[in-house]
Amino acid sequence: MPGSAAKGSELSERIESFVETLKRGGGPRSSEEMARETLGLLRQIITDHRWSNAGELMELIRREGRRMTAAQPSETTVGNMVRRVLKIIREEYGRLHGRSDESDQQESLHKLLTSGGLNEDFSFHYAQLQSNIIEAINELLVELEGTMENIAAQALEHIHSNEVIMTIGFSRTVEAFLKEAARKRKFHVIVAECAPFCQGHEMAVNLSKAGIETTVMTDAAIFAVMSRVNKVIIGTKTILANGALRAVTGTHTLALAAKHHSTPLIVCAPMFKLSPQFPNEEDSFHKFVAPEEVLPFTEGDILEKVSVHCPVFDYVPPELITLFISNIGGNAPSYIYRLMSELYHPDDHVL
């Protein structure tokens, strides 16, 4: 069929283009845009490819998911969306297969820890399965669109008048959170510049345009200023399975200073950043870029004698974090295991 062949080639081109974008580092896109694009591609794969049952579809999604995640292992949002879709397929198949889902809501910790992957049979064919899965993915896309607004809506519960708030670098979620609070409260924001990328300057400009009193400082001054700070509010790239963070370089320093001064550290992050990965998975955790910002190529004499590494991310252990604020509310780091079980199936943690 020429129509289906054209659809197939168009889909292949879209996937290839997305994979190439990931290989180049994702470009200027935010994690939310990456999540939406991944879901859009997976939805098209489900619609355009031929498959007869849930087992075949899951294998297809896994194969394409592995290809996408291998292109840029540090972009964990892509893998998270693949796992969400796999969980949707399992749930929709289970409903059609007559398996009740109600018991899942009341599982105990013991059950969560001891339940292995049940050898379910996904070979039955259901005509409704595709439309049900597409509908569930569309609902997830709608949920993604409202994540930032849902997080920002909780701002007034956490930020009070005349407080001094500290943040680091640039985060769209934190920016929206602070701007929402500024509509009714007056407070002062101190932004650590996040060298060598200095994204904190962009954050400071955006906040000052919104009428928020803002000060930019160097990362070296974090500890000296922390005694004046009431709260630290940061964003993150990934929330790891143990409740830790993979956040911009300098965040660990900020978190340690906050812990020393007993300053609450709040992390604003939507649920699609929650990943079942652990910090020992080096390929996906570390990301290094050219160290030109730290040591310019003009310093030729020194360059011959030293080896310079410029990591993009810091590891922030869960004991330094006070609270996570997501689009579904506030949670302690110790509750991450529960959220993980609701979002992803244990068999899908490794694609």
From Swiss-Prot:
One Pfam family of this chain: IF-2B
Consequence of substituting A127V: Found in a patient with Rett syndrome-like phenotype; uncertain significance
InterPro entries: eIF2B_beta_subunit (IPR051855), IF-2B-related (IPR000649), IF_2B-like_C (IPR042529), NagB/RpiA_transferase-like (IPR037171)
Result of altering E213G: In VWM2; with and without ovarian failure
Disulfide bridges in this chain: none
GO molecular function annotations of the record: ATP binding; GTP binding; guanyl-nucleotide exchange factor activity; translation initiation factor activity
Gene Ontology cellular-component terms listed: cytoplasm; cytosol; eukaryotic translation initiation factor 2B complex
GO biological process: central nervous system development; cytoplasmic translational initiation; myelination; oligodendrocyte development; ovarian follicle development; regulation of translational initiation; response to glucose; response to heat
Cellular compartments annotated: Cytoplasm, Cytosol
Keywords, alphabetical: Cytoplasm, Disease variant, Initiation factor, Leukodystrophy, Protein biosynthesis
Protein family (similarity comment): Belongs to the eIF-2B alpha/beta/delta subunits family.
SUBUNIT field: Component of the translation initiation factor 2B (eIF2B) complex which is a heterodecamer of two sets of five different subunits: alpha, beta, gamma, delta and epsilon. Subunits alpha, beta and delta comprise a regulatory subcomplex and subunits epsilon and gamma comprise a catalytic subcomplex. Within the complex, the hexameric regulatory complex resides at the center, with the two heterodimeric catalytic subcomplexes bound on opposite sides.
Associated clinical condition: Leukoencephalopathy with vanishing white matter 2: An autosomal recessive brain disease characterized by neurological features including progressive cerebellar ataxia, spasticity, and cognitive deficits. Brain imaging shows abnormal white matter that vanishes over time and is replaced by cerebrospinal fluid. Disease severity ranges from fatal infantile forms to adult forms without neurological deterioration. The disease is progressive with, in most individuals, additional episodes of rapid deterioration following febrile infections or minor head trauma.
Protein name: Translation initiation factor eIF2B subunit beta
Organism: Homo sapiens (Human)
